[in-house]
Amino acid sequence: MLKRKNYVNNISPLFTPPKGDKRRPAFINYALEQAKKIDVARSELNYILKLRDPKTGSIIPRHRQLNEHRAAAMRVIVPAMIYHFNITSDLVQASIEQLADECGLSTVSKSGNKSITRASRLISQFMEPMGFIKCKKKWDKILGCYMPKIIMLTPLFFELIGISKEKLNNAKKQQLGWLNTKLIERGLKPLSFSDAKLVSREKQINKILELRNNFHLLQRKKRYAKKLFKLDEKDIRQKIIKYLVSKYSSSELAQISLQEFKKQVNIEYFYLRNLANEPYLISRR
């Protein structure tokens, strides 16, 4: 009988932090050390908790533990999420693609197409239904596609590595206090938890928007931009305004000045105009 061939590209993935990155807060370093001590893929929580549909809350039938390849993926993606975790906002400040790349879970075919399926399925089919993380994705009305998911870590995620909700909350308070001390030193107003979450979310959305330079999306964006710029400038700007308004809640919009909002509209307008006028696309090297 023939031995079954491995159906994953990297049977021993390893998380490699980005080079030249900033020093991590003490709590993050502590959490990373905890993750080294515990086999998160075989945690008791994985057997006690039930998979639930994130949208409906209904139980998803499950008949076996994680297979070894998915378990290996979980063992590396957990420390990657911790490394990129923003303590005050609960956000993982990295996309699924970035996590997959840093963990050796992405592959590139001979034709040059990248696949992050191994990481994305672990997240959507296990970690989110188990309640370890929450994911949000927004429809990009300008480009006609979804933005990369925004990932948030829940207290249950930290229970995986033996960190209690109380210890997590204490770390949040300490980190916000440190952040506000720095702001006061610069003559700025201190932030509440909700303010800090808003600031972090803005940074995350801006980071996601930077991913627009990804070659795999450029052709689709270019087609849309060409179609859009057949309209009058007034109509184009109106569509951009509707898109930007949809990104924020009413309370968040109230905190953005008219001048800043106009600036965002102009940035979006000129970005799309340049894309529409670009004569050709240069493939990745």
Curated annotation (Swiss-Prot):
Coiled coil: none annotated. It comes from the Bacteria. The gene is repA1. Pfam families: IncFII_repA. This protein is essential for plasmid replication; it is involved in copy control functions. This is Probable replication-associated protein repA1. NCBIfam families: RepA_IncFII_LM. Belongs to the IncFII RepA family.
